[in-house]
């Protein structure tokens, strides 16, 4: 039996035809996926951006990657959550400095998803009774906290627990898009976008929300739990138990935090704004301070509200949990003074947070409430108590129900308005050995 060999030119023609066929098939498959996604999204969420979402590729963990010099980040479109943030520490090791989950699909399956590093909206924090008044009319929204007596972070169908579409995705930027059509009972439709951008050693966050059909309350935030060591903490023997890989040895400075919002035993704002005396467990304004010094400091006396001996707050989980009012000299610019400065002597990494929002919710990770495994690049075991610390920029907590604060122009947005909020995280690394 003889075998006829094709000439090289003919082989090349056939190979090119195969490539063209493969390309056409791939485009058809992609368009089919896009069409299915668009139909599904239009049916369930009414978003015109679903088709575009299907065109943007993810990595093998189902995450979207953006990067610039000195920084690389990954996201999932479930809540627009930050899943990974890599920097090099002072030893030149790449470390992932945020809490998260290994695969994008894990976020939707996480049974107690505490809005893990996602966008928070329409309304960040607690809303007492799930009620508010607007233009002489009372509104009741869905409640999801305190046995149905309060609304937390916009409700069970808050933006941090929703699938967001992708408006655009470039090498160093990603924009998530969401159309909230009266979810959880909030009035009107909120057309919104959230853009994450990285520049050399910097992560920028920008919110833009436009109410349509009816005015409504808007108070956006972005959660991110940081551990600047990336759980790579070492000692003289080179090994540290996971339980010691916390943020206790991180140093924190909140230069603008001379005041805080008083909360009751449930964490709801009472309407009072209190001073933070120098040297108290709330004093992060006078100087940089080791976080563990506050976590380990006993509260000297009996709390007036709960009549129990407390050491710094009313969070039953034992996590640090305080909302600070940011005091700025007028006129001010968000670039003038950072709202927070976090640093780790261990990794040599420092972070400065700048924002145009006027309240800062600081809380440490509560392993008791939300058991969470370390990501595979961070080691073995569970995230320990105080294993991370989050800084949520927002407006004054539950300002809707405290008219004495006169925050209507900051919390109620009409159809002729555009709500915006900007934050930036700037990183630096001390190259000397810690």
From Swiss-Prot:
InterPro entries: Aldose_1/G6P_1-epimerase (IPR008183), Gal_mutarotase_sf_dom (IPR011013), GH-type_carb-bd (IPR014718). GO terms for molecular function: aldose 1-epimerase activity; carbohydrate binding. Its EC number is 5.1.-.-. Pathway: Secondary metabolite biosynthesis. Disruption phenotype: Abolishes the production of fusarielins F, G and H. Pfam families: Aldose_epim (PF01263). The active site is at residue 392. SUPFAM superfamilies: Galactose mutarotase-like. Signal peptide: none annotated. GO terms for biological process: galactose catabolic process via UDP-galactose, Leloir pathway; glucose metabolic process. Substrate binds at residues 125-126. Belongs to the aldose epimerase family. Epimerase; part of the gene cluster that mediates the biosynthesis of fusarielins F, G and H, decaketide compounds with 5 methylations and a decaline core that act as mycoestrogens as they stimulate growth of MCF-7 breast cancer cells. The initial compound in the pathway is produced by the reducing polyketide synthase FSL1. FSL1 lacks an active enoyl reductase (ER) domain and biosynthesis of fusarielins relies on the trans-acting enoyl reductase FSL5, before it is released through hydrolysis catalyzed by the thioesterase FSL2. Monomer. This is Epimerase FSL3. The gene is FSL3.
């Amino acid at each position: 039996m003889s075998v006829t060999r094709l000439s090289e030119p003919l082989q090349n023609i056939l190979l090119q035809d195969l490539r063209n066929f493969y390309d056409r098939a791939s485009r058809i498959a992609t368009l089919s996926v896009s069409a299915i996604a668009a139909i599904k999204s239009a049916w369930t969420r009414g978003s015109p951006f679903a088709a575009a979402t299907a065109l943007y590729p993810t990595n093998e963990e189902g995450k979207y990657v953006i990067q610039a010099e000195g920084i690389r980040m990954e996201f999932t479109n479930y809540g627009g959550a930050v899943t990974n943030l890599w920097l090099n520490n002072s030893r030149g090791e790449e470390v992932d400095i945020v809490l998260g989950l290994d695969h994008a699909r894990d976020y939707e399956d996480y049974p107690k998803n505490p809005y893990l590093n996602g966008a928070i909206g329409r309304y960040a924090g607690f809303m007492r009774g799930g009620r508010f008044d607007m233009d002489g009319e009372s509104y009741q929204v869905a409640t999801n906290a305190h046995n149905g007596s309060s609304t937390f972070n916009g409700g069970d169908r808050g933006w941090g627990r929703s699938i967001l579409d992708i408006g655009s995705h470039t090498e160093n930027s990603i924009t998530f898009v969401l159309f909230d059509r009266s979810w959880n009972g909030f009035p009107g439709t909120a057309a919104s976008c959230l853009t994450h951008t990285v520049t050399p050693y910097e992560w920028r966050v920008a919110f833009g929300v436009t109410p349509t059909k009816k005015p409504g309350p808007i108070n956006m935030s972005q959660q991110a739990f940081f551990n600047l060591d990336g759980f790579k903490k070492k000692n003289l023997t080179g090994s540290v138990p996971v339980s010691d890989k916390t943020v206790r040895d991180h140093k924190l400075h909140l230069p603008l935090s001379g005041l805080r919002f008083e909360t009751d035993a449930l964490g709801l704002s009472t309407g009072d704004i209190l001073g933070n005396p120098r040297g108290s467990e709330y004093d992060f304004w006078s100087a940089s301070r080791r976080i563990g010094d506050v976590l380990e400091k006993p509260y000297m006396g009996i709390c007036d509200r709960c009549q129990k001996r407390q050491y710094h707050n009313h969070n039953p989980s034992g996590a640090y949990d305080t909302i600070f009012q940011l005091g700025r000299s007028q006129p001010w610019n968000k670039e003038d003074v950072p709202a927070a400065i976090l640093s780790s002597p261990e990794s040599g990494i420092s972070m400065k947070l700048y924002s145009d929002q006027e309240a800062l919710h600081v809380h440490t990770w509560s392993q008791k409430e939300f058991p969470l495994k370390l990501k595979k690049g961070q080691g073995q075991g569970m995230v320990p108590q105080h294993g991370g610390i989050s800084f949520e920029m927002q407006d004054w907590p539950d300002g809707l129900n405290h008219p004495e604060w006169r925050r209507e122009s900051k919390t109620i947005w009409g159809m002729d308005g555009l709500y915006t909020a900007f934050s930036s995280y700037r990183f630096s690394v001390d190259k000397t050995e810690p």
